[in-house]
Amino acid sequence: MQTVKLTSRREVAPAVYELLFTRPEGRIGLAADGDEPVFRAYSIAGSPKAEGLRFLVKSVEGGALSPRLCALNPGDEVLLDGEAQGNLLPARIPGGDTVWMLATGSGLAPFIAMTGDEGTLGAWKKHILVIGARTREEVDRLAAYAESEARIPLTILTAASREAGELTGRIPALIESGALEAKAGAAFTPESARLLLCGNPDFIRETRTLMKARDIVSPRLGKPGQLLVESLW
């Protein structure tokens, strides 16, 4: 365990902050004086070659850690767990011609890292990023942020669950209705599609169920698959 320092903070969407720390990698946690450190795993939103360590953190009212992280100022320090973990390794799901990245809220983070690197998703001809959140303002600002950071050709679609927008509704519902495929001009088939999911547990669970019905599953016990997931908690 070691200490890292915040070098910059900016709000990229309502209550969603980009936090840039000094390296190295791992999980971050904030420890108050006299308390045990509170650790949470956050996906890294930057290239391994970057000088700083970047995260997207949504400030959740009443949360044990996120409000404190989002209130940090440059120069403040946090504790870092040196053990980095992750499941979204695109090399584990080869094949297909289209990679779908489906994110809710700050689950966008790993896809900022992937689309900001020209080599990570180079095996696929088409890259589709779908961002879901409650409000149109949040998804629009997250989409603008993703577009500004991308270094590869990228189709970005947004879905606001509580307001009218480019797509209206939760991502699983848009998959079930066919609206998401129609908007993207691409299909969820095991032959063509590879999926990366990062977001809240309900979104992950429902999307996996819908994909299983289409024979799109995670690789397991040596069997190939087409889908990888990373849950926010």
Regions found by a protein language model. Give the residues of each.
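Ferredoxin-reductase
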Residues: 1-74
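A short, basic/flexible loop-to-alpha-helix module at the beginning of a structural domain
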Residues: 84-94
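Short helix-loop-beta connector
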Residues: 92-98, 189-191
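Conserved S-adenosyl-L-methionine
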Residues: 96, 119-127
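Conserved beta-strand elements of the Class I
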Residues: 99-102, 196
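Ser/Thr-glycine-rich phosphate-binding loops at phosphate-binding pockets of nucleotides
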Residues: 104-109
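Histidine-anchored nucleotide/phosphate-binding helix
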Residues: 110-120
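Reductase modules of NAD(P)H-dependent flavoproteins
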Residues: 130-233
